[in-house]
Amino acid sequence: LNVKKLLFVFLFFSFKIFSQDPVFTQFYNVPEYINPSFTGASGGTNISVLNRTQWFGLNYGLNSQFFSIDGFSEKMNSGLGLSIMNHQESTTRYNFTQMNFNYSYQVKLNRDWGFYPSISAGFGVKDYAFDNLLLEDQILIYQGIINVNSNDPFLTNDSVSFFDMSAGFLVFNDRLWFGANLKHLTNPNISFDNEGGKVKLKSFLSVHGGYKIPLKTRYKREKFNLYFNMNYMRQANFDRLDIGSLVKYNGISLGVFGAFAPTSLDSKSHKLTSLNFVTNMDYKRFTFGYSYDYNLSSLIDTKGIFEISVSYQFDSIFGDNSSIPCGCK
């Protein structure tokens, strides 16, 4: 089998994995992933980690991790942060890693409202792991053995690195927030073909918002809030809308989200693709999150998707905490 034909067939059937960014159900716990404008929005310093395990009922597993650290500087009137995302597929050994430096600038519209424009820049690496394939020059028929190495020079370019940028904005007060972000402004070339092939990484649009409603209790010390959150994402012909609510009482929250495919290209596919059950627990400066996505589509037998997240918030590493607080948490 011709190696180039083999590789292009391999990529064709894996297109959705290679050309799409991972998404996270707990976007509200790692907001820097959907929009760098959240950088510094908490007023202090925030560290977050999240792990997503997808389709663990199959041998075809997808796993994603996200890490971020950010803080607010009053002297610079800005938020500064670093984020790292990793995504891997267990069968093909495809791996996608991206590191970004995030910057946001605070504009105080008045005493209650803030406007955060932002920009993010970094580098990404997509590794297609073609060394996992068995090619024709490795099969030594007359000797009856398999050579562990291939001499085909086409396989030497199975990793692609690229520069990437995104820009966004966020408008918020202590109860309401709304923002948008556009990733991959440079539409980097992610083709492994060193003979002039071009495969553009499509722009990733995210539009998101939320609203917090304080609920009354008998005791003033009790904190009882209702949150409504939504996040719309679109990349090329694929889109998704997450919308739902959480009830938070004294540091413990429970909620449910629906994941929709608003403009599905398949008339037989489900518009509501999954029900996502979420919970959070605050303990001192920590926030622990867990979510489980129950699939309603043809992937119902894959045992769903679950995420675990941990966040830690403390005073700003820049020595000040004067930003307008965001009502996103």
What are these regions (language model features)?
Residues 1-6, 109-111:
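Positively charged n-region of N-terminal signal peptides that target proteins for export
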Residues 1-2, 13, 49:
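Short alpha-helical segments used as structural interaction elements across diverse proteins
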Residues 3, 19-20:
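Absolute protein N-terminus
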Residues 5-15:
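Sec-dependent N-terminal signal peptides
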Residues 20-329:
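Subset of outer-membrane beta-barrel
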